[in-house]
Swiss-Prot record:
Record key words, sorted: Ribonucleoprotein, Ribosomal protein, RNA-binding, rRNA-binding
Residue ranges with Basic and acidic residues bias: 105-124
Function comment: Binds together with bS18 to 16S ribosomal RNA.
Name of this chain's protein: Small ribosomal subunit protein bS6
GO biological process: translation
Gene responsible for this protein: rpsF
Entry similarity comment: Belongs to the bacterial ribosomal protein bS6 family.
Protein species of origin: Xanthomonas oryzae pv. oryzae (strain KACC10331 / KXO85)
CDD domains recorded: bS6
Single GO MF annotation: small ribosomal subunit rRNA binding
Length: 143
């Protein structure tokens, strides 16, 4: 019987370039066992709340999956035997979570704010240029 789980695992920051391959390996393990991945989010490198193995940052990955117990056990075992995985947490859920997590939403908002501020800065620069090149003084009278 399949159940829903939320899985978060932390990868050593020196192994960040290996994360896509690790995700593919875990995806194939889940899908090979007739499981379903409802949500997969790569949160990237983030600050740890406390040092783990003298590290202050780690690469975070979130999975919301629907698998049976045998596949989940195999997944957890693969986390345990992978030295690059610093920590993992598996939480049983009542149903599938498919909407974007709060961390990804806040990342998107930060990206939007950055884009807006960048656009505003460019608009300000463009607004300054025509005023400086206007020589007939029409803008001075209109203002």
């Amino acid at each position: 019987m399949s159940r829903h789980y939320e899985v978060v695992f932390l990868v050593h920051p020196d192994q960040s370039e290996q994360v896509p391959a690790m995700i593919e390996r875990y995806k194939s393990l889940i899908e090979g066992g007739n499981g379903t991945i409802h949500r997969l989010e790569d949160w990237g490198r983030r600050q740890l709340a406390y040092p783990i193995q003298n590290l202050v940052k780690a690469h975070y990955v979130l999975l919301n999956i629907e698998v049976d117990q045998a596949v989940l056990s195999e997944l957890v075992e693969s986390f345990r035997f992978n030295d690059a995985v610093l920590r993992h947490l598996v939480v049983k859920r009542d149903g599938p979570d498919t909407e974007q997590s709060l961390i990804m939403k806040s990342k998107d908002e930060k990206g939007d704010k950055h884009e807006r501020s960048e656009r505003r800065r460019r608009d300000d620069e463009e607004g300054d240029v025509p005023a400086a090149t206007d020589t007939d003084g029409d803008n001075a009278e209109a203002a």
